[in-house]
């Protein structure tokens, strides 16, 4: 889960995202749809008023059910881009899984891999982002209005340099931490 303590940045556009109200505290739960257990625990938090929104993983084992629950209950969902955890939906297209596996192998190789641009993976990044956006639209009936990433990989060099996040969408930044919360190496990566 994240809170509004994490600053957000909006990708510039002519029309601002209306869903984000200034001064509103957003408590967001990540990994929505990753597994049945994660979805069920998140629903419990939502019903208690502990969270106000979710970041949805698509192409995962519980993505379909999670989307149905979110739509029926009016839960605000953004896209939780996933480049590092294997897609687990039984109907995940093989090419999408293959491109994601190439990306994951590179990004998980060493801790600084995400700050380096990988030109040989440019098409794989485009393909995997597009596939996740298309699946989000299919499941939720709308394009995502906000983005974040599993393991914060939505801020990796390929995503930023290739400008793969749509203009006008809210994007979670992960650069504000309390003193001593992160190691120097971790802060350097961010």
Regions found by a protein language model. Give the residues of each.
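Boundary/entry segment of secreted carbohydrate-active catalytic domains
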Residues: 3-37
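Structural preference for beta-strand elements that scaffold enzyme active sites
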Residues: 24-26, 51-55, 74-80, 144-148, ...
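C-terminal active-site subregion of NodB/CE4 polysaccharide deacetylases
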Residues: 24-28, 34, 46, 95, ...
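Active-site beta-loop-alpha junctions enriched in small/polar residues
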Residues: 30-32, 57-59, 80-84, 150-152, ...
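A short alpha/beta connector and helix-capping loop motif
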Residues: 35-62
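Acidic (Asp/Glu)-rich catalytic clusters
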Residues: 42-48, 63-78, 94-105, 138-140, ...
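Active-site gating loops and adjacent loop-to-helix segments of metal-dependent hydrolytic enzymes
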Residues: 88-121
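Catalytic domains of cell-wall/extracellular-matrix polysaccharide-remodeling enzymes
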Residues: 130-190
């Amino acid at each position: 889960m994240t809170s509004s303590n994490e600053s957000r940045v909006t990708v510039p556009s002519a029309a601002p995202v209306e869903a984000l109200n200034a001064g509103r505290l957003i408590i967001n739960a990540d990994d929505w749809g990753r597994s049945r257990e994660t979805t069920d625990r998140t629903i419990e938090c939502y019903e208690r008023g502990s969270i106000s929104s979710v970041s949805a993983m698509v192409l995962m084992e519980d993505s379909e059910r999670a989307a149905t629950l979110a739509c029926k209950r009016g839960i605000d969902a953004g896209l939780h881009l996933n480049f590092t955890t294997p897609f687990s939906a039984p109907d995940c297209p093989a090419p999408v899984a293959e491109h994601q596996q190439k990306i994951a192998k590179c990004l998980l190789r060493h801790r600084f891999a995400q700050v380096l641009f990988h030109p040989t993976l440019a098409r794989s990044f485009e393909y995997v982002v597009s596939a996740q956006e298309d699946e989000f639209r299919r499941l939720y009936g709308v394009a995502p209005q906000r983005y974040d990433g599993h393991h914060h990989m939505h801020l990796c060099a390929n995503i930023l340099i290739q400008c793969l996040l749509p203009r006008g969408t809210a994007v979670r930044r992960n650069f504000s931490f309390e003193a001593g919360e992160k190691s120097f190496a971790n802060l350097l990566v961010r």
